[in-house]
From Swiss-Prot:
GO terms for biological process: translation. It comes from the Bacteria. The keyword Transmembrane helix does not apply. Belongs to the bacterial ribosomal protein bL28 family. This is Large ribosomal subunit protein bL28. It comes from Streptococcus sanguinis (strain SK36). Keywords: Ribonucleoprotein, Ribosomal protein. The gene is rpmB.
Length: 62
């Protein structure tokens, strides 16, 4: 299962590191994903949920 938020679709995005000399190298910006158990179709299932989704109340935990 990919590390993508089940509720908001947030996932890893790419960006650049910039040195003082303005050299650039690729870096990954990862979301704060937590493994939570939720009810999906009446059955408990473990899914990835972003911290933002958890705090905003979009997730109904078991």
């Amino acid at each position: 299962m990919a590390k993508v938020c089940y509720f908001t679709g947030r996932k890893t995005v790419s960006g650049n590191n910039r040195s003082h000399a303005m050299n650039q190298t690729k870096r990954a910006v990862k979301p704060n994903l937590q493994k939570v158990t939720v009810l999906i179709d009446g059955k408990p299932k473990k899914v990835w949920a972003s911290a933002r989704a958890l705090k905003s109340g979009k997730v109904e935990r078991v």
